[in-house]
Amino acid sequence: MRKTILLALFLALTGGARAQKAAGQQEARMRRGLATITVEAAKAHIYFLANDLLKGRKAGEEGSQLAAEYILSRMREQGVPPLLQDYGQSFEAVSKATLGRPRWMVEPDSVLPVKSGRYQRLALRNILGAIRGQRPDEYIVVGAHLDHEGMNPLLEGDPIYNGADDNASGVSAVLQIMKAFAESAVKPLRTVVFAFWDGEEEGLLGSRYFTETFPNIDRVKGYINFDMIGRDHKPEIPEYMVYFYTGSHPEYADWLRADLRRYALALQPDYRPWDYPVGGSDNGSFARKGVPLVWFHT
C-alpha cells in the first residue's frame, strides 16, 4: 500500500479549508495530520486484520466482529464521533439455504417477506464515524469493506483466507486518513464520513444497506472507495495505481492531478473514467444511487 495515495486523498479532502486559509496555522495543521500517515502504521493495521486469529473475517462470524471492534476502538481513540446515534449500524441479511454459495438479501427495515422454507441469517454491522464539515448536511463518504472470505477446511495446510490485500489494505488506508483528519483538526468543507462495510464479499450487503437507509443519501456528494490497494499490479512501476472515477465528473481527476503537482507526490495514476460506474466493490451501491465516485485500486 502506497503512503502517497493516502497523502493525495487527505490533501484533496481538506481542499475546501485550504482554499479559504492557504497559509499559516491551517497549513501547519494539515502537515501535522500528514505526518501521522506512515508505513509502520499501515503495517500494524494490516498485520492485525490479516492475523490468523481473525480466521479470515467471514461476514457474520467472530473474525469480522473482532475486526469491527478493532476499528471501533481506533475511532474512539481518535475522538471521531459516530455518524448516527451509535458507531455501529446493525442489520440482518437472509438467504434461502442452498448447497452452493448463498445469495443474501437485505431490506431497509431488516424485516423480509419470505416464503416458507429453510433460511440462513447473518447478523452484520457497519462501523460509521464522521468529522463534521463547514456544510454539515453535505457528505463525502470514504469507505472500505472489513470482511473477507473466511476459511476453507478443504484446503491443505493453511485453511485461512487472511485477506491482507482484500481488504485489510483498504481498511488500513481509511483508518490512517481518519487519524490524519483527527490530528490535524482541520474542518473540511463537507462532512467526511469514515465507513467500514460488513458483508461486501456476500454481495455488497453493508454498503447496500447504508445507501438504502441513510436519510440524507441525496446529500452525499461523493464516495471514495478503497479496495485491494496492497499489491503491485505492475511491479516494474511501483508508483502505478488505478484510479477509477465517474466520467461525468472530470474534476475528480483534476484535483488529483493538481495535488500531485503541488506536493510533488510520486504516483503514476492510470486514470479510468467510467460512464456508468458500478463495478464489483462497494462503489456499486453508491453508483446505483447516482453518487459520483472514486475507487483507488492497485
Question: At which residue positions do the language-model features occur?
Answer:
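Second-shell loop/turn segments in exported
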Residues: 28-36, 52-62, 114-118, 155-167, ...
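Structural recognition of the beta-strand scaffold that forms the well-ordered cores
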Residues: 45-50, 89, 126-130, 139-143, ...
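A non-catalytic alpha/beta surface segment that caps or lines the substrate-entry region
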Residues: 57-130
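Metal-dependent peptidase/peptidase-like ectodomains
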Residues: 197-295
